[in-house]
């Protein structure tokens, strides 16, 4: 699992490491060496590298990267966006080292648009070291808009240092325009902005590099889930039977949406449930019976569903919601299953019903998982979607903690919030899942 941090957390860790005795200039040199190694991947010794450097410490990283690559005998050009006097102290130190290495930088303000574009087109790779992850939340000036648009328009592959310039490091929103990188080198840890909102469309491949920054007491419970983190399926003993692996009730599907019932019941069986029963309105029982494999039981229900059918069975897990429709009053049923001990998963129309009886979330006994997309979560919280996207980690974590549940907020990097405050980013999303039925 790769650790994920916010820019604020990263700054605190950075400051703590410096306070503990590691000079900031030494950290910058380590970061530059690690980045230079990755920038050089796939390049020949004759391929030109153009490093575009801002005036902050991200630009200082870029100046050091350029010096290291040039020392290897590679053709390197440096384009600075500001004069030396506007640079941070560490950047000024690396600017001086660059001059000592007999590398003369170019300055963006002294070149024509055509000259800048020719510089970009003539490179094998551009290194974006203009802005770091602490970029203020305000539109970029016209100067930087032109610079970034020129980088993107050149068609030259771009490697961004820490985060693409123009992308907010906290929530992954662009500030009007952003570098579109084919690769982003994350210093020490991946920043949240690389994975949230627009981040994945601008960061390309994300490669973290360890430069020895310590956490210094900063508690971080965010991680990017990878294949080796998922221990599934678990080994099974030979002397077992169907009830060893649990009985699942799938309450999904209704007139016009019977497919939801099929998808949910099949999914429950495929993950290894010992016994799956698909509950469906009486008029759809024959349809499900024909569509589902024979090992899945179909239980028809009518208006007496809650009293006569469901209470008579004990379930190891209950799935409720996809395609159940909005014409039946499921309030009493929700209260019943949430007062029980069996884990409950609620999705889709089930969340719509939950909105109308939110009081059942208070003090619920059953372990609970909610799986909304952004629109459904907006309705659950009463907050507009735009507000949520500006701070999804805080809002999602608070909701999961306050209601003692697991929140699975679906998206490209689906966010999983635990009631204890941990946050996991799913790494397997893809735009092909943007179709009806993926949630089911």
Where are these regions (language model features)?
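Small-residue (G/A/S/T)-rich helix-start motifs and N-terminal tracts that mark the onset
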Residues: 1-80, 88, 183, 194-345, ...
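Short strand->helix junction
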Residues: 84, 133-137, 168, 174, ...
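Short, structured secondary-structure boundary patches
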Residues: 96-103, 128-132, 296-302, 429-432
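Internal gly/pro-rich beta-alpha loop/helix module
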Residues: 124-125, 130-222
């Amino acid at each position: 699992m790769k650790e994920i941090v916010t820019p604020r957390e990263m700054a605190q860790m950075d400051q703590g490491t410096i306070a503990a005795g590691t000079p900031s200039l030494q950290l910058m040199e380590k970061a530059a060496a690690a980045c230079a190694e990755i920038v050089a991947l796939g390049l020949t010794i004759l391929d030109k590298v153009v490093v575009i450097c801002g005036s902050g410490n991200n630009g200082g990283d870029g100046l050091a990267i350029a010096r290291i690559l040039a020392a290897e005998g590679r053709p390197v050009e440096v384009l600075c966006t500001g004069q030396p006097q506007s640079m941070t102290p560490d950047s000024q130190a690396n600017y001086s080292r660059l001059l000592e290495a007999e590398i003369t930088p170019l300055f963006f303000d002294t070149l024509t648009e055509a000259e800048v574009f020719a510089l970009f087109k003539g490179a094998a790779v551009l290194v974006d070291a203009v802005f770091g992850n602490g970029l203020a939340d305000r539109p970029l000036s016209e100067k930087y808009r032109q610079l970034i648009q020129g980088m993107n328009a050149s068609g030259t592959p771009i490697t961004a240092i820490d985060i693409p310039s123009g992308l907010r490091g906290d929530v992954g929103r662009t500030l009007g325009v952003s570098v579109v990188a084919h690769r982003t080198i994350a210093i020490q840890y991946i920043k949240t902005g690389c994975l949230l909102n627009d981040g994945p469309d601008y960061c390309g491949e994300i490669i973290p590099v360890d430069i020895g920054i310590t956490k210094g007491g900063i508690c971080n419970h965010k991680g990017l889930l990878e294949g080796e983190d998922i221990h599934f399926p678990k080994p099974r003993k030979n002397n077992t039977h169907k009830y060893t692996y649990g009985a699942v009730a799938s309450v999904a599907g209704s007139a016009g949406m019977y497919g939801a019932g099929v998808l949910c019941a099949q999914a429950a069986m495929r993950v290894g449930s010992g016994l799956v029963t698909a509950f469906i309105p009486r008029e759809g029982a024959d349809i499900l019976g024909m569509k589902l494999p024979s090992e899945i039981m179909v239980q028809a229900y009518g208006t007496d569903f809650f009293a006569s059918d469901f209470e008579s069975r004990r379930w190891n897990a209950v799935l409720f919601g996809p395609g159940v429709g909005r014409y039946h009053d499921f309030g009493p049923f929700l209260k019943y299953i949430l007062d029980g001990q069996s884990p409950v998963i609620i999705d889709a129309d089930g969340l719509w019903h939950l909105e109308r009886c939110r009081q059942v979330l208070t003090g619920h006994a059953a372990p609970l998982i909610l799986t909304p997309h952004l629109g459904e979560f907006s309705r659950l919280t009463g907050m507009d979607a735009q507000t949520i996207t500006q701070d999804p980690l805080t809002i999602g974590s608070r909701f999961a903690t306050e209601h003692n549940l697991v929140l699975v907020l679906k998206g490209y990097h689906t966010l999983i919030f635990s009631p204890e405050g941990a946050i996991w980013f799913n790494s397997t999303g893809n735009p092909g899942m943007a179709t009806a039925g993926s949630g089911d």
